[in-house]
């Protein structure tokens, strides 16, 4: 994170020190949680790639990038020095892609339903209004993460990652080949990569 942004987030303390507050502890818990989530998602991405789910691997990587930035935001509010916290974190393993997606969804759910709303309430009570708002904003993002993970998990479970109900436009993530059919081809006709490289084409520009 650039110095300019670190200073901007630090200004959210509104001239008050967070040392010794519950908000300080909650920020450190959030920083630790986001940092761990980032690393879990990188490992989940590797597992998805090995199973032939390149797009899901990319989504895990993208979400890991998001979590990394969340961690940096929470870290920017801290003032330094030792802080003791008591917190629980997932000690799960890297499983199959379906199980990894469900585990990720459950972690995101806990953050936006329980942890961050509570942290926001505490920050509000302690007079850190902008920090409270930051917890609420990140919570909304985690809600989107959960919804995406659950949709992807359903696709894996139902065998719909590479097969859709109607005619679908697929794109090769490697060479850009376009294929229109219910099912992605077993191999890309252009670059000969496996089916793993195909995803549903999305036009968002």
Regions found by a protein language model. Give the residues of each.
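Non-heme di-metal
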Residues: 2-205
């Amino acid at each position: 994170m650039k110095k300019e942004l670190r200073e901007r987030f630090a200004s959210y303390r509104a001239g008050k020190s967070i040392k010794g507050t519950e908000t300080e502890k909650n920020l450190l818990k959030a920083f630790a949680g986001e940092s761990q989530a980032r690393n879990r998602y990188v490992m989940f991405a590797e597992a998805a790639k090995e199973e032939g789910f390149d797009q899901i691997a990319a989504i895990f990587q993208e979400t890991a990038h998001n979590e990394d930035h969340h961690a940096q935001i929470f870290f920017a509010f801290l003032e330094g020095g030792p802080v003791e916290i008591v917190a629980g974190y997932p000690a799960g393993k890297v499983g199959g892609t379906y199980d990894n997606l469900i585990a990720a969804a459950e972690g995101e759910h806990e953050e936006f339903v329980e942890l961050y709303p509570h942290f926001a309430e505490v920050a509000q009570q302690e007079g850190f209004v902008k920090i409270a708002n930051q917890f609420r904003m990140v919570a909304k993002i985690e809600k989107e993460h959960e919804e995406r993970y659950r949709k992807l998990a359903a696709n894996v479970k139902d065998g719909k990652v590479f097969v859709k109900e109607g005619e679908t436009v697929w794109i090769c993530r490697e060479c850009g080949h376009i294929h229109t059919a219910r099912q992605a081809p077993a191999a890309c006709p252009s670059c000969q990569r496996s089916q793993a490289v195909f995803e549903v084409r999305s036009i968002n520009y």
